Amino acid sequence: MSKVGPNPFLQFYLNAKNDFINWVSIIWGKIRMIALVITLIVAFIFLIKLIKSCIYLVSLCKGCLTKTLTFKNKIIKWNIWKKIKRRTPRESRLKDCPIYLNNPNFQLN
């Protein structure tokens, strides 16, 4: 009686199939790793650009706010100065008027 063993062609096919699956899985793993690294690099560059643009916008808004506040401050100072200038000649005219110069009870408010 002859001993029946595994078919050598079938064994060769199974070995080749397993080798091919291992080879494909190794290459697929490397492709996934390269894709992950590229994705992380692109995300990092995007994050850096986003942070730079946010810093630029904050500095731009800060500059606008500073200019606006300075401009408003100048307007307020100018309005106060105009009020003082308007008031001063009238008060000086009142002071120089001979009727009020000799009156000790006269006071400017």
From Swiss-Prot:
Domain of life: Viruses
Assigned protein family: Belongs to the tibrovirus protein U3 family.
Full protein name: Protein U3
Upper taxonomic lineage: Viruses, Riboviria, Orthornavirae, Negarnaviricota, Haploviricotina
